[in-house]
Amino acid sequence: MKVLVTGASGFVGRALCDAFLRAEYAKYSIVPAVRSPRGLPGECVVGEIDGKTDWREALHGVHAVVHLAARVHVMNGRVADPLTSFRSVNTEGTLHLARQCVATGVRRFVFISSIKVNGEERAAAYTEADTPAPEDAYALSKWEAEQGLRQIAGETGLEVVILRPTLVYGPGVGANFLALLRAVACGVPLPLGAISNQRSLIYVGNLVDAILRCLEHPAAAGKTFLLSDSEAVSTPELVRRMAAALGRPARLVALPVPLLRAAATLAKKSALAIRLLDSLSVDGTSIRRDLGWTPPFTLDEGLRETAAWYANRKASPRKTTGKT
């Protein structure tokens, strides 16, 4: 089976392409699609992804597509209309690719969406049956892409699988998770000890394994799955487990949650506060029931792999980018 992987040079894309090199996946050949040359074996440079991208060369002979490429951020103050920027890549770019897949005979399209389509925070675990409630431009663009893909699937027979992962961590992670990892590794006291929430995350190895299952399982076609590790944890528990993986003490200070929330608001870090203070968990029953899939790695195993990568990164620094 020949598989096109978009966003192949990104955090998840690199892990997925590495997985295809393992012996058990020898039946697959991959076409890593990248925006600019990255030196990946067999890569296809497609340039900017939007509603006009020419995918014909990349899709030649391809049986399935894993669509990871997305716009995740826009520079504050530099984009007058963030929603238009997100839609250009995440909605129009996705649907244009799907239509070209239909035209070239691609059978299956695995779309990596986001748990943010469901919402930002909720005490109860999210399920696939919940009505989507995207709260920002990124999440809305992903939700609109999902709706468009379902319409294309209904009209053409393209086998669409939609995956909504929770926060992804693992070797190569960046952004807020890396900042928290660095703080724990450096022994910074963290005022998070009084937080009582539940957060679902997913180790990149588990996400890759789920993608591979969805590529080949007949029952995956037409389904949407929420993805996470097997357990949700509170923010203080995550810090403790992270510290254990790093071989460091967890230096937690218990400050009142309302005080933390107020401080985050003053610092214009409300989005970060939601991720640290509030709950967001998912019920993974559907993918277990329909595909027989369970995460092969535990949270602690994922954190140990991440900690080992971080230690090696400190020993021989290498710039990590979020570009796909």
Model segments located where?
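N-terminal Rossmann NAD(P)H-binding glycine-rich loop of SDR-like oxidoreductase domains
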Residues: V3-A26
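Glycine-rich Rossmann NAD(P)(H)-binding loop
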Residues: G170, L192-Q198, F225-A232, R241-G247, ...
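Substrate-positioning beta->alpha
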Residues: H96, V173-A179, G193-E216, G222-K223
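Active-site helix of classical SDR
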Residues: S141
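Conserved beta-loop-beta element that borders a ligand/cofactor-binding pocket
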Residues: E146-P171
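NAD(P)H-binding glycine-rich loop region in Rossmannoid oxidoreductase-like domains
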Residues: G39-G42, E48-E92, H96, Q100, ...
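Mid/C-terminal beta-alpha module of Rossmann-like enzyme folds, strongest
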Residues: R213-L272, D300, R304-A307, K314-T324
